[in-house]
Amino acid sequence: TSLTIEGIRLVVDAGLSRESRFDPASGLSRLETVRVSLAGARQRAGRAGRLEPGICCRLWQQAEEHGFRPRQRPEILDADLAPFCLHLAVWGARRPENLPWLDLPPRAHLAVAREQLAGLGAIAPGTEELLPTPLGRQLVKLPLPPRLACLLLRAREHGYGALAACVA
């Protein structure tokens, strides 16, 4: 995310960015520091002097750019798909792998999402289709990842809603 700030005439670009990566083995996402893409570097350079003349100082040699990716990897390839799969289930899209994707998400990520949602009780277990349960329909109404939404709802049932909100 970038924003334009008046008076900024110099951008120092280290050539790095933080990108979220989902690890299907742990079921968690983490931020990784990676080289910026060529498109990202061009966009950053445009931040200098957006409103007046400016300079972009890059902290890498131009020859290093041959190793840069042309553009950032599509986010869906590295995302936790559980929230998305829960929305698909509620919308009636039962088999995400059959949708006309621009970039097909990894099967492992879809499998982990199904497993996580079934474990929470958000979708019916033991089926390849995404069949939402009443709990799943409640979870999708909260603007949170399914695990946190489930934590809040279950804690509220036991009188610990405020504590769970602090933990979440």
Sequence positions of predicted segments:
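Conserved segment of the helicase C-terminal RecA-like domain
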Residues: 5-10, 14-68, 82-87, 167
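C-terminal accessory/connector segments of nucleic-acid motor ATPases
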Residues: 58-168
